[in-house]
Amino acid sequence: MDETLKDLAAHVTGALPGAVVAHKIAYGELTLETTPDHILKLATFLRDDPSCLFTCIVDVCGADYPAREQRFEVVYHLLSLKQNARVRVKLSAGEETLVPSVTGIWPGANWFEREAYDLYGILFTGHPELRRLLTDYGFDGHPLRKDFPLTGFVEVRYDDELKRVVYEPVRLAQEFRNFDFLSPWEGVEYILPGDEKASSQPGAPAAPKAS
């Protein structure tokens, strides 16, 4: 399998000089790294070339790395039924980078790109309807960014008096708790009714004495 993927990587990089900035093979899958300027050319080639025929787009997702100059990664997962192969295409983008939409190549990418826009704020130019998909109308921010607060900015509830959904600033009923996850977990020491015989087993807690 790896030899087939190596041949595929060599074929793509040779046919599109400059479009693939890096590639690697891991866990039986080929990853191609490109740029926003070359994504449409590379995507079209991967779909149409007889040695590729990646006609199925499985997913388009985002990832956030705030420490990087280009904080976002856009990842395309492709499947070729003809070649029985998968390929992953990655590109990096900043908060204001316009990433060309691949909906004209794979119409199934429509909602995938909307999800990436909704959750990360990645901008896809040329998308037929780039609007939020999972969050509510008027939602503030993008919840899968690493700098998005865990509690969000507002909470949504149904108001019985107003008979409608209302938005209010987040009010925590209690402070966050700090858990010591490095401490060993200790189980309960009581014996459930019917488990009295278990106390005779080595290492089992003693049965409680009758009062």
UniProtKB/Swiss-Prot annotation:
SUPFAM superfamilies registered for this protein in UniProt: Nqo5-like
Q: Which PROSITE patterns match?
A: COMPLEX1_30K (PS00542)
- Identify one Gene Ontology CC term for this UniProt entry: plasma membrane
A single GO molecular-function term is: NADH dehydrogenase (ubiquinone) activity
The cross-references to Gene3D superfamilies, in alphabetical order and at most eight, read: NADH:ubiquinone oxidoreductase, 30kDa subunit
Its keywords, alphabetically, are: Cell inner membrane, Cell membrane, Membrane, NAD, Quinone, Translocase, Transport, Ubiquinone
Report the principal subcellular site.
membrane
Q: Which reaction does it catalyse?
A: a quinone + NADH + 5 H(+)(in) = a quinol + NAD(+) + 4 H(+)(out)
Topology in the lipid bilayer is annotated as: Peripheral membrane protein
Please name the Pfam families in this protein's record.
Complex1_30kDa
Biological function: NDH-1 shuttles electrons from NADH, via FMN and iron-sulfur (Fe-S) centers, to quinones in the respiratory chain. The immediate electron acceptor for the enzyme in this species is believed to be ubiquinone. Couples the redox reaction to proton translocation (for every two electrons transferred, four hydrogen ions are translocated across the cytoplasmic membrane), and thus conserves the redox energy in a proton gradient.
Family per UniProt? Belongs to the complex I 30 kDa subunit family.
Q: What is annotated about its quaternary structure and interactions?
A: NDH-1 is composed of 14 different subunits. Subunits NuoB, C, D, E, F, and G constitute the peripheral sector of the complex.
Output this protein's name. Answer: NADH-quinone oxidoreductase subunit C
Provide the species name: Azorhizobium caulinodans (strain ATCC 43989 / DSM 5975 / JCM 20966 / LMG 6465 / NBRC 14845 / NCIMB 13405 / ORS 571)
Source gene? nuoC
